[in-house]
Amino acid sequence: TLEQLGQVNLLLGCNNCGKSSVLDALFLISGAANPLLNIRINSLRNYDRIEPDDLLLNYYNLDSSVPINIAADMKDGLSSRELSIRPLLAQKEVVNMTDMVKTSPSNQETSTNYGFVFDYRLTTNGEKKAYESSLIVTPEGREKREAQVYPASGYKEQIVAQYVSPNYDLRESVKILDEILKNKEEHHIVEILQQVEPRIKDIMLGEKAVMVDVGLSQRVPINIMGDGIRKILAVIVTLFKSKDGIVLIDEIDNGIHYKSIPILWSAVLSMAKKNNVQVFVSTHNADS
């Protein structure tokens, strides 16, 4: 149980002690009616297989007989949410006759759908509502690496949550930065980046790339500026986008020089306050 949470919360601990699991749980409960999130948290770690055994990875000790249960009380003291994730395994009723004649007969033949179900319960001002959504992989979908998603009927998520993983994709930052540039708000980003690299004069989007002016004859891709600059950009544009929402940052100091850590934290604290964002950060480095 996590209690007395604040606007900015730091999870500190050694490797493999469960810090990322806490962030995963927060991500799931923030989008409790979205079954895709159970797949997304694995893809954040560059693991995107959807075989039956892979769906067990989020269960404690790989034991799916015990559902994943997550609950959260909201700040207003009047609402709460509960999420239970249980596996789904069902025999398929439709048999492909063409496939059947091509294979050797066996009395153990099966055609199975698998996936999981999200049971979501929301309490607001004493009024309780229940929703159900699911993700199902059919035999055909398994071959194509596709899943069928059945969203919760009549429910629209009100919480905006973003997850910045250690393996963050800079392309996501490009999408967010595009919105910032359209609103002429990029000076907030540039001011923070200049504290790490004073040569940066401005920032813009090129052909699917973030370009910066560092005083050379032409702008250069931010990709060549090092991991630290890219990580800081990913964090601050995500905070900028997530007004009145939640941002989860796993291994915040990964790839960042220790001298730049205070700059990053200053940006996190100021932008969290300015945009009313609740932030959860993990690190294994006590210096952070």
Where are the regions that the model predicts?
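Switch/communication elements of ASCE P-loop NTPase nucleotide-binding domains
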Residues: 1-37, 211, 219-288
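Phosphate-coordinating catalytic segments in nucleotide- and nucleic-acid-processing enzymes
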Residues: 32-240, 246
